[in-house]
Design a protein with these regions (language model features):
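Long, hydrophobic/aromatic-enriched structural stretches that serve as scaffold segments
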Residues: 89-157
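Residues on the lipid-exposed face of transmembrane beta-strands in outer-membrane beta-barrel proteins
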Residues: 53, 65, 96-102, 149-154, ...
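Outer membrane beta-barrel transmembrane domains
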Residues: 223-342
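Transmembrane beta-barrel strands of outer-membrane/channel proteins
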Residues: 61-71, 113-121, 165-171, 209-217, ...
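Surface-exposed strand-loop-strand hairpins of Gram-negative outer-membrane beta-barrel proteins
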Residues: 40-42, 70-93, 128-140, 182
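Residues that define the transmembrane beta-barrel architecture of outer-membrane proteins
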Residues: 88-95, 138-148, 185-191, 229-237, ...
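Outer-membrane beta-barrel translocator domains and adjoining extracellular loop/strand segments
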Residues: 73-81, 124-133, 165-166, 175-183, ...
Length: 342
């Protein structure tokens, strides 16, 4: 009888622990879903710049095709610690980018306009828990994403530095239905003010230090709970240190290698409500930091280059933590004019 009572006691304690764990998992899951409604990331996806961050295209039309692949299997809380969730968060996007740079100068620099035509994007989210595999959240979607329009870019070039300032806005052209699980777009407008700088550390411009900054502000979005909110502003910094190596003596082929990284922070509170009773400013600010490498193959005379970038996130707060891969190429028409002889 005593053994039976002891067994019953242990069984009830196990049930209580299980209930607590389930309640904890549900709480974290609800918090994650609420946070996603508050847009726990910037509209700008970091990992796109790296080396040559301050160099504008040569006069003419430049086409860039870039594939972005972000994957994460860890979800961090406001302290930067992993939550008891398992699963994955994946984004695959193909950007078709068009630059136009006229030949005339403005304020001593080059003018440029750019548009990232509706991006083909595919995203998926699968959340669960090791202890409760049947309690899970699944979402995902494929389609045309938001459009990045950059109507103003002004850049200057000297012997030791290339730099530009730019303004862009994000048009919510991607599919977005409040509360839907297959959204591709963000559901709101955004504004971005940017600066890119490349410093040549050597006279032959082979060694470079690069820095890109982006300040983004956000418009109002409608949540799946019928309320409206404004995601907090975000700041993104991308950096890189690179070295160009000639593959041929005539410099017709170059290989560029370097260390790159990115940092992104939410710098102001969300405003509005996630639900009619849950203020959006209760969601903690997010941040993420990554480091990796870039390699670029350049054919200067043809205006062609191919690039590959890989960056691993080593810290994330209140958002997923994973890695970013970007690869693709660009071509300029007409072919760039050869640089003047030194």
């Amino acid at each position: 009888m005593d053994q039976l009572l002891e067994y019953s006691k242990c069984f009830m304690q196990g049930v209580a622990v299980g209930i607590k764990r389930l309640a904890c998992f549900v709480g974290v899951l609800v918090l994650f879903v609420s946070a996603s409604q508050a847009q726990q990331k910037g509209q700008y996806i970091p990992g796109q710049q790296g080396l040559n961050a301050g160099i504008m295209p040569s006069p003419g039309i430049t086409y860039v095709n870039m594939t972005l692949d972000y994957s994460a299997d860890r979800f961090n809380n406001a302290s930067g610690n992993a939550t008891p969730l398992t699963g994955s968060y994946d984004i695959w996007a193909i950007e078709n980018i068009f630059y136009y740079v006229p030949k005339f100068k403005f304020l001593g620099g080059k003018l440029g306009v750019m548009i990232a035509a509706p991006i083909v994007a595919n995203g998926s989210l699968t959340l669960g828990a090791i202890e409760f595999p049947n309690a899970a959240l699944n979402a995902g979607g494929f389609g045309i994403a938001d459009t990045w329009v950059q109507p103003f870019t002004l850049g200057w070039s000297t012997k030791r530095i290339d730099t530009y300032v730019a303004y862009a806005f994000v048009a919510p052209t991607g599919r977005y239905t409040p509360g839907a699980s297959d959204n591709v777009g963000s559901g709101y407008w955004g504004n971005d003010v940017m600066n890119g700088t490349t410093i040549y550390l050597t006279k032959n411009k082979g060694t470079t230090a690069n820095l890109f900054t982006n300040w983004e502000t956000h418009g109002v979005k409608t949540t799946g709970f019928g309320s409206v909110l404004t995601p907090g502003n975000a700041v993104t910094i991308e950096w890189g240190l690179g070295q160009a190596l000639p593959l041929k003596k005539d410099l017709s082929q170059l290989l560029q290698l370097g260390v790159i990284g990115y940092d992104q922070w939410q710098v102001s509170n969300n405003s509005g409500f996630i639900t009619p009773l849950l203020p959006a400013n209760l969601v903690p600010h997010y941040s993420v930091h990554a480091i990796g490498f870039q390699t670029t193959y350049v054919l200067p005379a043809r205006g062609i280059n191919f690039f590959f970038k890989w960056e691993k996130e080593y810290q994330a707060i209140a958002r997923p933590q994973g890695r970013t891969i970007a690869f693709g190429g660009s071509i300029t028409f007409p072919k760039p004019e050869p640089p003047p002889a030194p």
